């Protein structure tokens, strides 16, 4: 019982330590709301959505690679080659 309690306390301590010592990314969203500013977290998400539409702020590559019928494809969750027309069952089926 004591060992279980010690493990739980250690896990909580390490989790808190991870969040406290985390370094902010250089690519963070500008003008994000926060606890101290008026608007709070409700202001964060609409601004984040608008900034992600801006190609200069967002460095994500949203281009989809389409495979033709009969070509190899990957399940969308795992890879980046999709069947844009039809279904993927290791190969594109129209």
Swiss-Prot record:
Task: Keyword check for Ribonucleoprotein, yes or no.
Answer: no
Q: What is its main location?
A: secreted
Q: Where is it expressed, tissue-wise?
A: Expressed by the venom duct.
This protein's GO cellular component annotations are:
extracellular region
What are this entry's molecular-function GO terms? ion channel inhibitor activity; toxin activity
Pfam families linked to this entry = Conotoxin
**Keyword terms of this UniProt record:** Cleavage on pair of basic residues, Disulfide bond, Knottin, Neurotoxin, Secreted, Signal, Toxin
- Notes on the domains: The presence of a 'disulfide through disulfide knot' structurally defines this protein as a knottin. The cysteine framework is VI/VII (C-C-CC-C-C).
Q: Which family does it belong to?
A: Belongs to the conotoxin O1 superfamily.
Q: What's the name of the protein?
A: Conotoxin Qc6.1
Q: Give the species.
A: Conus quercinus (Oak cone)
